[in-house]
Amino acid sequence: MKEPRIFPRERPTPWTRAPLPPRGRLDGGPGVNAGHPMGVNTDPFLMAAGSLGGNLAPFARNPAPFPTPSGSLASNPAHFPAGARDPSMTSFPRGMNPTGTGAASFPRPGGLLGPGPGPGLNPRTGALPGSGPMSNPRLGGLPGPGPMANPRAGGLLGASPDPRSGGPMGPGCGPNMRAGVLSSGTGPPNPRPMGLGPGPSPNLRSSFLGTNPAPRPGMFPGPGLGPNPRACGLGPGLGPNPRAGGLGPGPNLDNRAGGLLGTGSGLNLRMAGPQGLDLAPILRAAGLLGTNSVSFSQASGNMGTNPPTMTRVPGPIGPNTGPSSRGIGLSGPNPSAMSRAPGPMGPNSAHFSRPGGPMGVNAGVFPRGTGSGGLNPAAFSQSSGTLSSNPGTFQRSAGLQGSNQAVFPRASGPLGPNPANFPRATGLQGPSPAAFPRSAGPLGPGQVAFPRSAAGHLGSSPAGPVGINPAPFARPTGTLGLNPASFPRMNGPVGKTLVPFPRVGSLPGSNPAAFPRPGGPMAAMYPNGMLPP
């Protein structure tokens, strides 16, 4: 029995010169468009919008699982023209070169991530990466912006040079097409298609992570303040000034509306990126990572630290409400005290010298509220950073890794040895009732026994999904810009040392305050304060 062939072998439109698809194309396999649970796609080669977007490749894609639903992200505005059912036989407007990139006008329904590359006559929602050179309405695609003025909505990541509404992550740029997703760049206003790179267009755009000053119908994130309607992906909109993207720092000021992760209402030279520093005061509107209600000079990147003060408003990871000299990045410590408002990782209401980043160190103690990363109903001096810990007594409430009911009083010095034993609450690896006395180590004698909570990603961690170590421990100085103060060892793949105390010594052994233990997800304490190899 032959596979069901929905279309006759003859081409309904003589002007399409594309070859017929091979007969065996649909044999067997899911490709057959027969009674698929998701619905049958009328065209076997229709690049239906899939979860990842339309397929741009010349090979047929199985449309069955992806019926053409009308939807914000995956809608098929039109069926293929009869001749365009095979990708190779894309229907081109007369005179267009079939081999031209994006020349084919497939009325392909846009995939989740992107607009179809073919900008042909047929309006099509976006396909994955390609931008269509022709002006056809299409939904934004993943990375590639269409150079032409096509009204298209932003795809997940892609930006369209044309005025289009932003997708979840895709910026819609007005005349300027720029989809700086993660990194930002400063550039001329010329439309430039970019995937992850920064788009230099002057349009302000709001983004998932970045904010867009331009008013635009952004899907997710922030309001557009600028004259240019532009939706932005992860990267911040440059506005009049080209600005740094999500990952990269941008030297110029720009207005940004708050994006999911991005800051938006105030000017900021740079938004803190994972690796970028913010050098100028930034007003951050509420974002995924937190809003900054006060201008702060720098936000630290993942690895970088920012010396100037900044305040943050609550975000999933924890807002900073008080001025602090630096916002911590992944590894960078902040020397200045800043208070943080609640976030998923837990609100910080008190000043602490450094806001903890995922791996940042918190120098000060502050009460921490419940957070997704390990709920602490009782105030305890642990910074809200993912891995950072603050010295001080706190009760630890149940977290992903197990609950610690015991209060851990901490004594003596910023990270000084704590004489009190900490019973370990039951964790994934089981309760550890015994306290661990620690004697002198690189950092000096530490008498503290501390409970170990259930294992984190890399090992036992007192609390938090990533394993927040409540116990103070020295921060290693090193590539990540951790505290130069003495520390027995860096824990974790990146060396998570979350010592929440102000650094004193510049050398690893120079810190006068001996703190008994280096804390970390992997930290198994030995009497001498050393960590296991």
Curated annotation (Swiss-Prot):
<feature type="region of interest" description="Disordered">
    <location>
        <begin position="1"/>
        <end position="37"/>
    </location>
</feature>
<feature type="compositionally biased region" description="Polar residues">
    <location>
        <begin position="379"/>
        <end position="406"/>
    </location>
</feature>
<feature type="region of interest" description="Disordered">
    <location>
        <begin position="67"/>
        <end position="251"/>
    </location>
</feature>
<keyword id="KW-0597">Phosphoprotein</keyword>
<feature type="compositionally biased region" description="Pro residues">
    <location>
        <begin position="214"/>
        <end position="226"/>
    </location>
</feature>
<protein>
    <recommendedName>
        <fullName>Decreased expression in renal and prostate cancer protein</fullName>
    </recommendedName>
</protein>
<feature type="region of interest" description="Disordered">
    <location>
        <begin position="319"/>
        <end position="347"/>
    </location>
</feature>
<feature type="modified residue" description="Asymmetric dimethylarginine">
    <location>
        <position position="368"/>
    </location>
</feature>
<keyword id="KW-0539">Nucleus</keyword>
<feature type="modified residue" description="Omega-N-methylarginine">
    <location>
        <position position="396"/>
    </location>
</feature>
<feature type="modified residue" description="Phosphoserine">
    <location>
        <position position="160"/>
    </location>
</feature>
<feature type="region of interest" description="Disordered">
    <location>
        <begin position="370"/>
        <end position="434"/>
    </location>
</feature>
<comment type="similarity">
    <text>Belongs to the DERPC family.</text>
</comment>
<keyword id="KW-0488">Methylation</keyword>
<feature type="modified residue" description="Phosphoserine">
    <location>
        <position position="432"/>
    </location>
</feature>
<dbReference type="GO" id="GO:0005634">
    <property type="term" value="C:nucleus"/>
</dbReference>
<comment type="function">
    <text>Potential tumor suppressor.</text>
</comment>
<feature type="compositionally biased region" description="Basic and acidic residues">
    <location>
        <begin position="1"/>
        <end position="12"/>
    </location>
</feature>
